[in-house]
């Protein structure tokens, strides 16, 4: 009986470790990576890029105009926008760390 329990525990540990390893490998090869900003640091290319990224980020926002405004400000400063409509701020540290004067997150 002890042998069977030991084998089951060992098998479950192997499954868990292999799933963690595959998740780490997929993240390392850019499956959830943020697209880099254009080479031009200023001007219309950056504004167009930020506009497209912020449209995607704010498409489900309740106050879309406010979301687009603050996302645009953060994008121009940080030159990145996290993927998805919510969360994923770990992809862009500058975007994540920007705070309003009240100490709340500035970037949507």
From Swiss-Prot:
<keyword id="KW-1015">Disulfide bond</keyword>
<protein>
    <recommendedName>
        <fullName>Gibberellin-regulated protein 7</fullName>
    </recommendedName>
</protein>
<keyword id="KW-0732">Signal</keyword>
<dbReference type="InterPro" id="IPR003854">
    <property type="entry name" value="GASA"/>
</dbReference>
<comment type="similarity">
    <text>Belongs to the GASA family.</text>
</comment>
<feature type="signal peptide">
    <location>
        <begin position="1"/>
        <end position="23"/>
    </location>
</feature>
<dbReference type="GO" id="GO:0005576">
    <property type="term" value="C:extracellular region"/>
</dbReference>
<keyword id="KW-0964">Secreted</keyword>
<keyword id="KW-0939">Gibberellin signaling pathway</keyword>
<comment type="function">
    <text>Gibberellin-regulated protein that may function in hormonal controlled steps of development such as seed germination, flowering and seed maturation.</text>
</comment>
<dbReference type="Pfam" id="PF02704">
    <property type="entry name" value="GASA"/>
</dbReference>
<dbReference type="GO" id="GO:0009740">
    <property type="term" value="P:gibberellic acid mediated signaling pathway"/>
</dbReference>
